[in-house]
Amino acid sequence: MDKTTGLLARLEYPGRLIAMGLASAGARAVIVYAITGRSPSSQARKLVLRDRGIWVQPTDEDVLKKGNVDLLVYPALLFGQEGIAVSNGKQTADIREGLASGAGPVPVLAKALAAWDFEPDAPIFTPRISGCFVRGSAGLSLVRRGESGETLRSYFEVPLREGEGRLVSTYEGPNREPLPCFEGEPRRMALAGTTPRETAEAVYRALAPAAPDKDFRVAVACVSASLSRPDDLEVYIINRTERT
């Protein structure tokens, strides 16, 4: 069991996750975005490459409407000449706007997310997880609810070491009620594979359940970008609905 499989296999239900790091071969940044879902509305989605980004779109409009559409449909990744923005919500657009500021990833995230709170999905209050790759560097962010209801914002530099990444997810992993939200610093993980396809497939396999009737996987996307030319992209997407 490699470090990718080992970490992700322990997460029975991670919700959505972002992993960022450096490819195991070549000077390319890697961004992984994955969706898992328990409810029918969360499952009724897919990732689609369009309009200079990767968008979360419904596979069944009627089923999706049974959930909170505002939280279920959004741009997961947006590409710009200066870099890449990624998140689990509509805050992705604000992050992309900040990529052209000339600032590094942490200042870009801090400014873009200053007005964003955790998701209004009581009693869980799902965190907003975000990241960006800009100016040859990467960063991650976690916006979550504190014990007294306050908004806690954390920002992290992501070290770019060959074959290694950092991961944040919306939930800690146990599938129980209420879902325990992610806390602390991003988890260290190996980035398996030398291409976006190999990395996406490794993540998709690692998220497979022990019991087939509890397969929460929805989609996985992997993007690699040149460190010197962030608009030089390679993309691979896996949608579970297209594999069954």
Placement of each model-derived feature along the sequence:
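Conserved short alpha-helical segments that host acidic/polar catalytic motifs at enzyme active sites
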Residues: M1-T244
